[in-house]
């Protein structure tokens, strides 16, 4: 999965997919009542990027729905996975469940079109704080209460705080989650980060008894770091330059081992070599 980083304006969806992304990451900010408000990152952000592009959250969802609904004039067949980077740092811990409920209602209405031929992409809820695990239950309970438990098949999870793998496993236990888990690891492109924890996550994924199904590394903009991440066995790479990742995947060393995921590849299934 080539994951376009910080795609917060509707126009950027096309831009990143055209460069080779089959997945995008979008920032979601919340107001003081735990309502998802904007797709917005703000300053500071990755080096070499405009941090200030934004949409109202529901407008972005509608644009995303167009891009992922077969038959729509804006449809992009390649775009199969969306990571919502939930900026819950502005919320109190006791608002996490509420944030999940409100997020689910917004997605149900504006992205999934109340279950009536909505967008088809798989969705990952990426949460920065382990204490905010109740967001997951708020979200999943709401889908069930609204009569759309089938949409849970399209839903995955990530804790993005680079916490110890054991602590993340614990948070999922508390949240009642088993399966559909992506584990992120990374840092802004302005800084360097080794692959120690990525290798630990990959080992958990491949052990057959860990909690992780997929591992992604962020934010990778250079060919050398792309090769290192692929050598470590990641499933996804988040990048500001999808064309760089595409180029490396076409190199002889990687062409036979990796391919770009399509809609038929289940993002919740651990790949068996």
Swiss-Prot record:
InterPro entries the UniProt entry points to: PLC-like_Pdiesterase_TIM-brl (IPR017946)
Compartments (UniProt record): Secreted
Keyword Chaperone assigned: no
SUPFAM superfamilies tied to this protein: PLC-like phosphodiesterases
Cofactor note: Binds 1 Mg(2+) ion per subunit.
Gene3D superfamilies in UniProt: Phosphatidylinositol (PI) phosphodiesterase (3.20.20.190)
Disulfide-bonded cysteines: 45-51, 47-190
Function, in words: Dermonecrotic toxins cleave the phosphodiester linkage between the phosphate and headgroup of certain phospholipids (sphingolipid and lysolipid substrates), forming an alcohol (often choline) and a cyclic phosphate. This toxin acts on sphingomyelin (SM). It may also act on ceramide phosphoethanolamine (CPE), lysophosphatidylcholine (LPC) and lysophosphatidylethanolamine (LPE), but not on lysophosphatidylserine (LPS), and lysophosphatidylglycerol (LPG). It acts by transphosphatidylation, releasing exclusively cyclic phosphate products as second products.
Protein name: Dermonecrotic toxin LspaSicTox-alphaIA1i
């Amino acid at each position: 999965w080539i994951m376009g980083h910080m795609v917060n304006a509707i126009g950027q969806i096309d831009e990143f997919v055209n460069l080779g992304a089959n997945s995008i990451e979008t920032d979601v900010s919340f107001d003081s009542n735990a309502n998802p408000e904007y797709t917005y990152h703000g300053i500071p952000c990755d080096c070499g990027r405009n941090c200030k592009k934004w949409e109202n959250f529901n407008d972005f969802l509608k644009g995303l729905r167009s891009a992922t609904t077969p038959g729509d004039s804006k449809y992009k067949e390649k775009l199969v996975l969306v990571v919502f980077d939930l900026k819950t740092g502005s919320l109190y811990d006791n608002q996490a469940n509420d944030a999940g409920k409100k997020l689910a209602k917004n997605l149900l209405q504006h992205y999934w079109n109340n279950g009536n031929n909505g967008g088809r992409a798989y969705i990952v809820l990426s949460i920065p704080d382990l204490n905010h695990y109740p967001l997951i239950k708020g979200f999943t309970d709401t889908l069930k209460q609204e009569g759309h438990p089938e949409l849970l098949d399209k839903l995955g999870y990530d804790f993005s705080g680079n916490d110890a793998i054991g602590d993340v496993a614990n948070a999922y236990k508390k949240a009642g989650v088993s399966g559909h888990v992506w584990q992120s690891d990374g840092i802004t492109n302005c800084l360097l980060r080794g692959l120690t924890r990525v290798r630990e996550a990959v080992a958990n994924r491949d052990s057959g008894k860990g909690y992780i199904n997929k591992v992604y590394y962020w934010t990778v903009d250079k060919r050398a770091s792309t090769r290192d991440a692929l050598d470590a066995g990641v499933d996804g790479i988040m990048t500001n330059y999808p064309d760089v990742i595409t180029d490396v995947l076409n190199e002889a060393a990687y062409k036979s081992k990796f391919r770009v995921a399509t809609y038929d590849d289940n993002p919740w299934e651990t790949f068996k070599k």
